[in-house]
Structures are given as C-alpha cells and as structure tokens.
Amino acid sequence: MNRKTYWKDVRKSFSSSKGRVVSIASLMALGSFALVGLKVTPPDMQHTGTSYFTKHQTADLTVTGSYGLNQSDQDLLNQVSSEANIEYGYFKDVVLKDSTDAFRLFSKPKDISTYEVVKGKLPSKQGEIALSSVYQDKYKIGDKISFSEKEGDNGKDVLKEHTFTITGFVQSSEILSSVDLGSSTAGSGELKGYAVVPESSFDSDVYMIARLAYKDVRTANPYTQDYTDKVSKHEDELEKLVKDQPANRLKELKADPQAEIDQQTSQLQTAETELNKKLEQAKASGQDKNPLVQGQLTQAQDEIAEKKEQIKEAQEKLDSIAEPSYDVYTRREARWSEGYVSYETNASVFQNLSNIFPVILYFIAALVTFVTMGRFVEEERIKAGTFKA
C-alpha cells in the first residue's frame, strides 16, 4: 500500500511540475531563438546591402570640386580609368517653392549609383523629375513641382527650368536614410528630400561630381575590412592625384581674365602716352589755354583715371579668388552618407547584442532552474521524510 501511494505521489509530483518545466524550456528556447536571430541578422543585413549596392553599382568614391570639375580635372581623374569606371554628373541644392525645405537635384546617372524606381518611371526629357519615395504620399505622378535656386558665382542659374512634371518616385543607392539626409547649402540648411532630373536640365560648363566604381571591389562586401582597406588605398591615390590641382586650376581660372586686364592696361598706357603728347603739343602751340581744348583734355584725363580705377578693381577682384578645393569621399564620408553609416552601425549593434543578450537570457534560465529545482528537492525531501516515518 505504501509503495502504491509512493508511486502515485511521484506521478503527481511530475504532473504538478508541468508549469515549471514549460517555463524553464521556454526560457531556454527564448535564449536560443535570440542567439540564432541576432547572429543571423547582421550577415543578412550585410548581404542585403551588398546586393543592393552591386545592383545599382553604387560609387565607391566620389570627387567634388568647389569650382566644379572642368576638362583638365576630368583628364586628371581619367588616369585611373583602367582601375575604375568613372561617371560625371551634376547636382544642385534648391528650395521647394513657398517653403524653406531644401532639395538636392541630381542629374540622372547612366550606370553608376543608379536609382531604384518605386513607382512610375525615371525622367527621360527636360522638364521631368522623379522625387524621393518618401514624397509619394504628398504628390502624385503628373503633378507639377517648383523650386527656386540661389544664383551661382557667375550670376547665372544652374538649372534651365524650375518647374517640373513628376514622372515617378525613386530610392537612391547613395542616400539610404529617409529621415536624416544631411546638410544643405539651401533653405533651412537641412536636406529634406532629393530628386533626379535629366542631365539636359542643367546649364553648366563644368560637372559637379565624379563617381568612381572600382573594379577590384565591385561585388565585395562593403562591410568587411578588406573592402575598407582597398577603398582607402584608392582614396589615397586620388588625393595624391589631385594634390596639385588647386594651384593649377586657379592659374587656369585666372589666365583669360588676367590676359584681358593686361591688354586693357597696355591700351590704357598707350592712350595715356598719346594724351600726354597732345597735352605737350597744345602747350607748345598755346592751345592749352583754349577752353574747348582744355575741356577735351580734361575729359580725356578723367576717362583715363576712371579706366585706371576699373582696371585696379578688376585686378583686386581677380587676386582675391581663392584656390579651389577638391574633396574625395568614401561612401561613409560623403555629405549624404548618414543613412549608409546608420545601416552599417545597426548591423554592428546587432552583432554586439548577439554576444551579450542570449548569455543574459541563458543566465536567467539557469537561475530560475536552480531556484525551481531547489524548491522541488525541498518539497520531495519533506515527502520522503513523511513516507519514511
């Protein structure tokens, strides 16, 4: 009878402990799922990013110049064309009409840093535009959108028109964030959106950006140290390549205006010499006291003095022109890189969490198991004493 009661009690102990078993198993499973999920997430994010950048041939390096990129700049950069595919383009920061919202308008690329079309199509002719996809709830295809722009240093607008017809909505392969798009030289100073227009919409003698996609890292994982090291090496090479270009470009910029000033100075000196001769002749002949002759000579002297002042101002203005600057950016350093950096950082955060969070869950599960088993043993010890008695 006692044996029967004993086994009945054992079965009852197991059945009454189902909740404890399920709780411990759930905690262990949660730790396992967290471990697997967090370990898998960073590689998946990196794979997704790599596939996206490869599909759109996102530029590994970009080069910009404060005075744009003229033919001599292009000839210099084309020296690395055997190592990289190079594409030149335009961009301009503008302000959405009747607001302070800054937009960056890019020229439509051919092959490098292309766009993902979310809805509609890319612009194909002048006067058309595709907006960033975050604006598809505010605008629809076929709507008109207008911008205003600040004049360039030459007093001219860079854009041929400022009102466009929306043809679609896109996502950039360079600007990954939809919230923090970086700073802007227009409007409030904070970039609110971007758009792409045909290259023919720009009216500029120089390109504004060069994009380089290197062949040795074309399909590489951009989140690896190998990719970083290779791109860093290419960046150093480009910086050395453009090191002397600021002085050369400044000399180039000043050449024609300086030649014009020198020519005008020479002509002025000739005119001044002729005037002095006429003045001496007038004095010799006594005509210098003639009111009419005096008036003509005085007018000529005033004109020469005015011309001298104009030449002086032109020379001072020319001398004040600063050397242009050239900037070489990686994907992480570009002025619109916030989204890229955030994506990379998030992948790294998940990687770090995968090394910590599951351990905490396993520790909690072990602690709960220890406490539960301790109580269970204590209960069974009491029952064992009862049976023994």
Model-found features: residue ranges?
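Membrane transport/envelope proteins' first extracytoplasmic loop
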Residues: 3-363
